[in-house]
Amino acid sequence: MTALKNDRYLKALLREPVDMTPVWMMRQAGRYLPEYRATRAVAGDFMSLCRNAELACEVTLQPLRRYPLDAAILFSDILTIPDAMGLGLSFGVGEGPKFAHPIETQRAVQNLPIPDPEGELQYVMNAVRTIRRELKGEVPLIGFSGSPWTLATYMVEGGSSKAFTKIKKMLYADPQLLHQLLDKLADAVILYLNAQIKAGAQSVMIFDTWGGVLGHREYLDFSLHYMHKIVAGLIRENEGRKVPVTLFTKGGGMWLEAMAETGCDALGVDWTVNLAQAKARVGHKVALQGNMDPSVLYASPARIEQEVRSILADFGEGSGHVFNLGHGIHQDVPEQSPAVFVNAIHQFSQPYHK
């Protein structure tokens, strides 16, 4: 593989010295870019775009051509695993994901296959290999998966949800069934992420989008427990260097200490968390990624720069911070805003790394 020219993202995740704070944006390959919308139109629909390695590579690289980002992230979806398990994933026009065969019974859980990453999910690995080749060592490639809890919410609810009544009914009325499902999903995620690493991903991230809807004990038992299992099962070194692992629970600020005990290298934090406090709590164990509210990108360039400066000041001196948004970028932000954001981070962070 080509030698890496810019490794400050990987170094920051391992809390090693860097010259400036690295940055990438969740959903940086996405609908806010006109070139993404054009490529998606060529593909026909979202999953066709994910399944075409050349087009998935193209949209992964698009934001890097516009902005001096410090990492690329695989263009894919967290629901590839349940889709490969045969649940019948579809995306309606203007709608979220839907599953034709939601999980409701013991038999349904028992019958779920664990997908072969080089079989039903080979299209993802082909995309990883293609992107890694086309990056030519410019920046590292991030692979990812949804967390078992977050995948289970979609599989049991049959799609997106606001109240999560079906999966919470299973959690409280039949916890053993939910544990069986989560355990199987954890095994599937371990295989999937390790295959991404073998295919060329240089860092991996677990997105626990819906962990924050759980109560305290339930989060530890039904979400974090299974992320811990995944972290323990991952390949942690490849191509002669460490493969850092980042956990991100949206709304998970109260569990940072417990998350840091999993053996991961970094924690993603959303905008509800003060970075100075997070660093004081867990900065001796893990790096932190985040955490600007994506809605700040609707503001003026001066306001964006002000927010960047504030977050950099919150983290303070030293390595161990990857700048990011607190969640995915919105599709209708002004076209110049991401450039202001990225350039401000690189410019204003340098004094913190002397």
From Swiss-Prot:
Keywords from the named record: Cytoplasm, Decarboxylase, Lyase, Porphyrin biosynthesis
Subcellular locations according to the entry: Cytoplasm
InterPro entries recorded: UROD/MetE-like_sf, Uroporphyrinogen_deCO2ase_HemE, Uroporphyrinogen_deCOase
Site for Transition state stabilizer, residues: 77
Keyword Lyase: yes
CDD domains, sorted: URO-D (cd00717)
GO molecular function: uroporphyrinogen decarboxylase activity
Main location: cytoplasm
HAMAP family: URO_D (MF_00218)
Subunit description: Homodimer.
Protein name in UniProt: Uroporphyrinogen decarboxylase
